[in-house]
Structure formats: C-alpha cells, structure tokens
C-alpha cells in the first residue's frame, strides 16, 4: 500500500512536527535514510520521532530500511534507534558498522539483511528513480556479493536472491536489483516555502537528490528536515540541490547541527573558510604514522587517489608533514575532492576541500577506473591475497565503498598492522620494537568471506600492496610475496610465526626505508608518474 501524502495548499509544502510527519509512514513501508557517520546530513529529528513512536504505539511495523552510507557513531546514534524488533523486518545497507544495533539484529537472525557495495547501492537508487529494474556492473565479481558466494546475504534467514550473475559479450557481470523506497528521510540546511532546498551549512551532498527522486517517482513521501525556512523563490538557483516538487513534508529543527555534538556550523568544514595549513605538522611517530609513511611511498605526482577510513587515513597528514600534499589529489567516496582528510566517525568532513561532488557521481568515476591509487584499511588477509573487512569476529561491519574502490583502482594499497588485539610497538633508534604482540593473527590461511578478490585483481592487471608496521607484501600469481621487513624485527619470530601461512620470500627482500623509523621529516620527494 502506497503512503498517502499530505496536501499542499497554494503550492506551499506542508510543514509538520517530526511526530506528525512519521504518522504518515504505513506498516510494511520501505524507508530510505540519508546520512553519513558523525551526523553528516542525518535527519536525526525524524529518526528519533519514528523510534519513539514505535516504542509508544508499536506502529508502524515491519519496515524495510535502505541506508546507502554508514550513518551513526558506532554506538547508539544513526539508525541504531530504529533497531527495535517488530519495527524493522528487512535492511539493505552499504555500511552497517556505524549503527551497530541494527547489525546486532542481523547477527541474531532477527531481520533479513543484505549488503550491496555502497556505490552500487546508490546507483540502484538512481535506477529506481528512472524506473529501471536494476544495474549491471562488474563491481563485486569474486567477492561475497557474487551469487556464487554469499550473494550479499548477511545471515541465515536472508534467502531471496537480489543479485544475479549475467553475461554479455562473453564477459561476466552482476545484476543488482533496484529496490524502490516509499519514504525518504533526507536533510538540508534551508528550504523555501515550496520546498526548494540548499545545503550551505552541510559537509557534503551525498545522494540526497537521488534518494528524493527515487521516492518521488515511485509514489512515495519525501520527508526533509531543515534548520530554517525562507520566503519562496529567494534562494539562489545554483545553490538549490533539491527542487521543491520532490518534497512532500518539511520538518524544521532550529537546533539542527552540522555534526554530532559540535557547534551548529563549523565554517571550515562547510567550505566557507579556508584553514591556514602553512604551519608544518609534526605527528607523533607511532605504528599508525609508520604505516602511513610507507603508504605515501606508493603515491606519484599528479595522481588521483582515494583514502578510506581507519589506519589508511593518516596518509594526507603525513603528506602535509613532508610538504607534498599539493602534488596529488585525495578523494573520499562520499564526494569531497582534495583538502585535509578528517579522521574518526565523521570521516569525509574535510577542510580546504577543492570540490564536492554528489556521491553517486563520485562512484561513477571510481567504477570506471578513474583512480590511480587507493588506500584502504584491512581487517584480514589470506594466502591468495583476498581481503576481508565486511564481517569479522562475528560482527557485521558491511563493505562501505571498499568493494567499489578496490575493484578498479590501478594501484591498491591495503594498510594495517600484522596482528591485532593489544599490539604495542615502539620506534626508537631507527628500529621497530614489538613491545607486546597482538593476540589475533590478521594474515590467515583462508577467508570465510571475501571483500576483495586477489584473483580478480590479478586478472584485471591491478598492482596490489599490503603494508604493515613490520612487513610489506605484494600480490603475484602464486600469492603474497614478502618484499620488505622493518629493521629491528626477526623474520621468523616476528613475521612468519605470526601468520597462518607462509608467504613467498622475495629473493630481493630488503629492509623498509630507514627514514620511516626516524622521528623527523623524511625529506621525501614524490616520484613522477610513469607514462
């Protein structure tokens, strides 16, 4: 049953309280939620109102949730408040770990749970807006979203196949079914009385327009939270990102903040002010910085790269310290291009950004092989060079943009530590000392589920590295090759004994560059790109 929209009077968009708005959500509706981690573009007031209504009335029931980007704080925010039995029956997310209470329901087999790659998911919403049945892509071949593996299903109660293997001109592709949502929760900064909306205080745009079009064109209700309203036709047309005819309900929250817990607006993050970054940084020399330093060695002048969340996100700061940050461009999948990369849950809230694209377009660029290099953090690696991040230690994290980015980037740099669980190291006198070994081995014999396929990467001619604090590996046809080790570590005791398989030891095995282990600027000069 399609939801019933409130009427417009004299062209004015209905302005309701959040509590009134969520009364328009019927049982069995499919709700698509905009937002990224740390409160970016999150319609918190609407989410809270829906969660509270269900607690009090046990309605609406059996919703399906679509969330392209991981929103939340890795605890109780984001869509975690919606994780109530009976409220949600089904979920399709690009990333799960930012809202872990939803992940808990999936892990306990209490909801049907799917994971599409984040970029693919936003593209299927664009397809839904155009009334196309889905998208066809080679992104995800050989990974857990491939129907020959798990088909993107995250638990035992998830049975229906949403992803199919198809073939055109003797080449394999995946067909991803587009799910048309009935309700949208989106957010902007300002709208006029007819619903035309601007994003001047926001960090980025994500796929707000795509979601609104998908819901509108399928007869649903677009609910938009804003911080303020203005007179109709007074917003600059080039600033308007959402046309008013897409919006059915507006909820005004004058206390809406740009991110969780901060001032209402940080003008550096919104792009209005430029931060003076001329002062040289000096980051503490630890294992995180060590990995980022070694990763920087894989960058080339003029390259366009992507940086992911986790230990990999230090590369931009190390490049600033070395004075070469302006010699290449780092992008984030949610839309930012250039600037200083943020860290933590509000990943993508960059400053000094050069441009901001909508997320769907950013992924089009990635899928087509536009990236020269990407820097991604890994959870586990197996003997075939496969990487796992979407599910480990029994926890569902989801892929985010990991599959989209790593499938086609010309050079792929995976960053992490060799072991996990209370690993402690110190760097002194140009050497690495393992003070306390991690309890958990991260290099295992076989991954139970694959987020990155080493086999497919080799078939596509991609260059793959795995950089840790004590060892560097590269991927070849016969598996992982150990090519560098840190000064101060023992090859057998500190590396081989801490892996569940034995890599090929390169005959040219060498020590990692000694400059990495000295607590001073390395004097690193970016190499020219090969032509």
UniProtKB/Swiss-Prot annotation:
Write the record's keywords in alphabetical order, separated by commas: Transferase
Give the main EC class: transferase
Origin, by domain of life?
Answer: Bacteria
Q: What is its EC number?
A: 2.8.3.8
Which SUPFAM superfamilies did the record assign?
NagB/RpiA/CoA transferase-like
Per the record, what are the reactions this protein catalyses?
an acyl-CoA + acetate = a carboxylate + acetyl-CoA
> Which catalytic residues are annotated?
333
For the biological process aspect of GO, one term held by this record is:
protein homotetramerization
Task: Give disulfide pairs as residue numbers.
Answer: none
Gene3D superfamilies registered for this protein in UniProt:
Glutaconate Coenzyme A-transferase
Q: Which InterPro entries match?
A: 3-oxoacid_CoA-transferase, CoA_trans_fam_I, NagB/RpiA_transferase-like
Listed GO molecular functions? Answer: acetate CoA-transferase activity
What role is this protein assigned? CoA transferase having broad substrate specificity for short-chain acyl-CoA thioesters with the activity decreasing when the length of the carboxylic acid chain exceeds four carbons. Exhibits high activity with acetoacetyl-CoA, propionyl-CoA, crotonoyl-CoA or butyryl-CoA as donors, with acetate as an acceptor. When acetyl-CoA is used as the donor, propionate, acetoacetate, butyrate, isobutyrate, and 4-hydroxybutyrate can be utilized as acceptors but not isovalerate. May play a role in short-chain fatty acid metabolism in E.coli.
Its subunit composition reads: Homotetramer; dimer of dimers.
State the family it belongs to.
Belongs to the 3-oxoacid CoA-transferase family.
Give the free-text miscellaneous remark of the entry: Formation of the covalent enzyme-CoA thioester intermediate proceeds via an unstable anhydride species formed between the carboxylate group of the catalytic glutamate of the enzyme and the carbonyl carbon of the thioester linkage of the substrate.
What is the name listed in the Swiss-Prot or TrEMBL entry for this protein?
Answer: Acetate CoA-transferase YdiF
